[in-house]
């Protein structure tokens, strides 16, 4: 039976659904391709829609210092993936100073200035003028309903991953009677603030690092010694020392900084045990042979379109949330998150400062989404998800009047395409409408 169109959003915000489906539809959605036309779309501001344009592709200076997504519930380098989490590559020493020890108040004016400069550059290069004020998620949801109508589908069948769950949940809230079979995998919790979203993702990464270190130490060839805490500290020590004196790499003029190592570690943690081996090799080379060549290879995978992806994420996210707090609040948060997430927490507290400086801000307060009257919505959460913590999936499934939670026991960001048993349950729902039973747990094959 042909069911019409299945619309896909791979996350971001800022990732191209068009490029993602071109690259991944054959493999990622093999189980449903016989029944659906798989449609990727670029939301407003993204890719082949009228894009937010900030600079020539080779001009990295226009990247906001850390982007709102640093780290962020984001598109994973997983089987369900078109791209990588791009914008944890802070270019600026000021920002890395904030991450490593300079007081928040001392670093704040310079960070704010970077965001202001980035906004000015994006505003100057983006046509039509004023687009930066109209790329919020609710506007994208209205566009998506027009796409649904144009495609001839009475109902929207949809699979959203990571940020795509936020887009999908808002669609179901605004257009419940148009909502068909909807899968939200790697869920964001729409009821929490931007800072809570950032802090949750940061703590998730910190937990994922400890899980990885334990896995590494239980296997062969792990360069990290002691227990998981000691091993995590060795990763932080490597980052700090490479920021002092960058590691030589296979490219003579491009030594690898600690900031880049942190980005590469984070990128690797979006994967799972299938891909963690390359992180172990990279750490071993850096710690025991004082070379960053393998880390350089990982960072190369993450830099595609870094300028515009970071800026688009910035623009969309800042419009989705009001600025929350002031310098005193942000400074206190900075101390708290550095304590809770010492490896990745350095940038987290700047999100509201960055959005305030960016200047295009939201007015809608975060609130639970109920989607009253919508068809059943399948929410999928992975217990070891580093970017969208499992409790967010539980929370979203509880908020939705017709939500059903499927739990994947496993690591890595998002479940679909990662674990065959989970993928099959999702495919069955999309093809037949049959939901997994309440409380259903699926596991990775070992």
Residue ranges with predicted function:
Residues 70-82, 87-94, 100, 231-375, ...:
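Alpha/beta-hydrolase fold active-site neighborhood
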Residues 1-107, 383, 395:
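N-terminal cap/lid subdomain of alpha/beta-hydrolase-fold enzymes
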Residues 409-446:
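Catalytic active-site module of serine/aspartate enzymes centered on a nucleophile-bearing elbow/loop
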Residues 372-373, 378-381, 385:
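Short beta-strand/loop motif that positions the catalytic acidic residue
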Residues 16, 141-142, 160-172:
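Glycine-rich nucleophile elbow surrounding the catalytic serine of serine-hydrolase chemistry
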Residues 53-96, 170-234, 268, 281-297, ...:
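A catalytic-pocket lid/entrance helix-loop region that shapes and gates access to the active site
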Residues 127, 141-155:
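Conserved acidic catalytic loop of the alpha/beta-hydrolase fold
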Residues 386-391:
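Conserved alpha/beta-hydrolase "acid-adjacent" motif
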